[in-house]
Regions:
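Small-residue hinge/turn detector
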Residues: 74-78, 104-105
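Outer-membrane beta-barrel proteins
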Residues: 181-194, 245-251, 308-311, 382-384, ...
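Bacterial N-terminal signal peptides
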Residues: 1-8
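Exposed, low-structure sequence patches enriched in small/polar residues
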Residues: 153, 158-162, 268, 313-348, ...
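C-terminal extensions
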Residues: 17-69, 107-166
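Outer membrane beta-barrel
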Residues: 187-283, 403-420, 558-571
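Boundary at the C-terminal end of the N-terminal hydrophobic targeting segment
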Residues: 13-15
Length: 651
């Protein structure tokens, strides 16, 4: 359907200019219509990208390691950018990026969200001054629910109040940067999540040093990874490489200790060594003998049961990555040792029998990457010593012409393989275990204003997963197309077909569709209308959503207002709607049942851009029920209303 739609409109698209690609467009394409279990640590990954979007990189001065944080950019593309700057001088406009070999259409669309181009005169005239200037930001956020959950009204229940509080700040001076964060979740009695980091960056042999909280990723993330993205975008998103400070609010997926990146240039390529050492306490559910049954990742400590799991097991991780790069070839090896001060005993349930057991775990991997102009190949093979399991992942990307990209991702993850710090693309979540599969990917922009992207994926899971008592298969096909007939209008459509065994050993087929129209008569105003549908087991869930964005000419004031009507049979037929959120957070709502959702966000920024104030109010009205949620999270009533406020000071 999308292909016919694209071909019918092809002759109308020539010479037209696409609407600006916004942060909301990016998040929508990355998050909506994806299962929670398929998303893995996607929200934390999007949250880190939100911080990068709010503090874009100067493309003319950013180090290669920094540019590799930008989604869609490959190592080859980063090298081409630096080569272009070396030969032709600083990049002056975004349009100049089209002249750089290796920059695809997808990169050209996403890059403006995460980079900035500073005028060359300012770069030369203020170079020394900028380095010596102290810069930073501090923000405080609070969320206030205008309702009570059952946990606040019964005893025993939640110990604290229902408010959410968060502090976060960063300081930067010359080559040093430091940051801190603290958070209190609803239901907790006090701030119980703290963290910070100190990072030093140099251009000599010691490229980067991070003390405190950090994240790390090497190769394809099979041993240790810091973010993965599956689905329509998995082939254009490169896995995060190296070390970087922990800037988000996640309470589980990070390391705490010290790490460094050392690089030496030789006559036969560049050598890099990245050692790391981490020790921290993790939340865990213990059995009667004091063994670890489950590692908890939500960071919630509201009830006595949850507080009993708080920091109950110590986790040590030590290792590093050794890499070598020469022209078009990169080779590397990763080794890591993990140890817990309590043994892991996940239980005898069938799906838990492949979970890691014991207290000592060792891993080793080899990774590679090579680029031949329009062909890029990369991959990793990993081995876990305690159970003798293998895992392999490869990515092949071919760009025969600038406006066409083809991809292939074969993978094999033995059910005997495991790594508690891994993060790699899988059909379910981001844990590379118990899966083999292959994905085909296609992305093209035949003419300006028309683009088409599709992928097909098949995976096999030999060991029973949670809720399934047999081996299982999953097949997925997804396609999306975008058409911009003029600078003011844009049409977008997505269809997904999914077939496989689900919980309860039931074979199901899902059809999901999303149609979207955007109208932007001028830069300060935009209107977006979306129609969503989800069909499974001969029942249909659907929703209609609209969003209006407006801002003043001086950009001091901005507002976003949205409304959604949803009508689904049950949770199986749920729909997803992205909702603009406060600075430094991501809001991707899941709706089931029958109801209406409305939200509004207003932002004010001072003329000198030092002060920022954001306020958001969201309300959901359930038509089909007077009781929402279950257990201690139950809400007695049809309404669910929240108010969030954020204040930021930058200097």
């Amino acid at each position: 359907m999308l292909l016919i739609f694209s071909l019918c409109l092809l002759h109308h698209a020539g010479g037209q200019r696409l609407l600006p690609y916004t942060w909301e467009d990016f998040v929508t394409s990355m998050t909506e219509d994806e299962d929670e279990e398929e998303g893995g640590n996607r929200n934390e990954w999007i949250e880190e990208l939100r911080l990068l979007h709010e503090h874009p990189l100067d493309i003319n001065n950013a180090a290669p390691e920094a540019l590799m944080q930008v989604p869609t950019l490959t190592e080859e593309a980063v090298e081409q950018i630096h080569a272009y700057i070396y030969l032709h001088g600083a990049i002056q406009t975004l349009g100049e990026l089209r002249l750089i070999p290796g920059i695809s259409e997808e990169m050209l669309r996403v890059l403006p969200l995460f980079i900035r181009i500073q005028p060359q005169a300012n770069i030369q005239g203020n170079k020394g001054k900028r380095k010596k200037r102290l810069r930073g930001s501090m923000d405080y956020r609070t969320d206030i629910p205008l309702y009570y959950r059952k946990g606040y009204c019964v005893s025993p229940g939640y110990a604290g109040d229902p408010l959410y509080h968060r502090y976060r700040g960063e300081l930067e001076y010359a080559d040093a940067r430091m940051g801190f964060r603290m958070e209190k979740d609803p239901g907790e009695t006090y701030y119980d999540s703290f963290g910070g980091f100190l990072m030093l960056e140099k251009k000599g042999w010691m490229r980067r040093l991070v003390v405190g909280d950090f994240r790390a990723g090497f190769g394809q993330g099979l041993v240790i990874g810091s973010g993965s993205q599956w689905g329509i975008s998995s082939h254009i998103i490169s896995p995060s490489q190296g070390i970087r400070p922990m800037r988000g609010m996640d309470e589980y997926r990070f390391l705490r200790g010290v790490s460094a990146e050392i690089r030496l240039n030789t006559g036969k390529g560049a050598l890099s060594l990245t050692p790391f050492l981490s020790w921290r306490k993790l939340d865990a559910t213990l059995d009667e003998e004091g063994n670890v049954r489950t590692l908890r990742q939500d960071g919630l400590h509201r009830t006595q049961t949850e507080r009993n799991t708080k920091r109950s097991v110590g986790h040590l991780a030590a290792g590093g990555h050794l890499g070598w790069k020469y022209r078009w070839l990169s080779l590397g090896t990763t080794a890591m040792w993990q140890q817990t001060d309590r043994p892991l005993q996940p239980g005898d349930a069938l799906y838990r029998q492949i979970y890691p057991k014991g207290s000592r775990f060792g891993h080793m991997a080899m990774d590679y990457a090579c680029a031949f102009y329009r062909l890029q190949i990369s991959g990793e093979a990993a081995y876990s010593f305690d159970r003798g399991g293998w895992a392999t992942l490869h990515r092949i990307r071919w760009t025969p012409v600038q406006k066409l990209q083809l991809g292939l991702i074969p993978r094999f993850y033995s059910y005997r393989y495991h790594s508690m710090l891994s993060s790699a693309p899988t059909a379910y979540g981001s844990v590379p275990q118990n899966e083999s599969g292959i994905m085909l990917h296609l992305s093209t922009q035949p003419v300006e204003g028309l683009s088409f992207t599709a992928y097909a994926d098949a995976s096999h899971h030999p060991w029973p997963r949670y809720g399934i008592q047999q081996e299982s298969n999953i097949f997925r096909i997804q396609a999306e197309g975008e058409f911009a007939p003029s600078h003011a209008h844009r049409f977008w459509a997505r269809y997904q077909w999914k077939h496989g065994v689900e919980r309860g050993d039931v074979m199901r087929t899902h059809h999901q569709i999303r149609l979207q129209w955007e109208w932007r008569p001028r830069e300060q105003h935009s209107l977006r209308v979306s129609l969503m549908g989800h069909q499974a087991e001969k029942r249909i869930g659907w929703g209609l959503s609209g969003r209006w964005q407006v801002q003043s000419k001086d950009k001091q004031w901005a507002g976003t207002f949205s409304a959604t009507y949803f009508d689904t049979y049950d949770y199986l037929h749920r729909i997803w709607v992205y909702e603009p959120s406060l600075i430094g957070s991501v809001s991707n709502g899941t709706f089931s049942g029958n109801g209406i959702r409305g939200a509004g966000k207003i932002r004010w920024k001072s003329r000198n851009e030092q002060w920022t104030l954001e306020t958001k109010i969201g309300a959901t009205y359930r038509i089909d029920t007077r009781i929402q949620g279950s257990g201690l999270q139950t809400i007695m009533g049809r309404w669910k209303t929240d108010i969030g406020t954020l204040v930021r000071y930058s200097f």
